[in-house]
Amino acid sequence: TISSQINNIGSTVNDTAQLVTSDDSHIEDISTAENAKNTDGVITKSVNRGTVYGDLNVGGITGTMNIEYDVDPEYDLDLRSSTNVKLRSTVNDIVIYCVNYGEVTSRKDCAGGITGLQELGLIYGCEGYGSVKSETGDYAGGIAGNSVSSVSDNYSLCNVESDSYAGGICGQGYTVKNNVSIATISGDGEKKGVIAGTTDS
């Protein structure tokens, strides 16, 4: 019956939630430029010339860089608040040598020329030329809208607009190094910068 199928789905989701919130955890992010030779988890030399519009977490190359549940692919693991995950795994999540020329717009938070939300992995050697805008939210960047991982050796020449947290490379960044930005930043709120609106480490 339909109700028994719904119960089975609920049980599966509950089991997954217990896996994610238990105390025995370790996820090791091994995303480096050297590991880009391993093609698993790597997007390389890709170019976007199209217009991208979405609700949140919108990017010219990828919307989100994160771990995804098989049970519900639209539910990503929030690595900022979930430090206990009952699995031991290494993660290789790299976007390298990609270029965005297209206009990227999110209706809410997290718009980026390369990725909207980067919660793990590495963005390396990418270029952003298309305008990036967060219409009613925060976190817009020429490369990454919101990054809590590594963004290095990238270049942006674009317009970036957001209420708050707007940057030529990252709206908000964590490890941001060796980047070059010639971006125009606009918006009514706070925390704006040609490289990053703010960094948090």
List PLM regions with ranges.
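Predominantly extracellular beta-rich ligand-binding scaffolds that present long acidic/polar faces
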Residues: 1-201
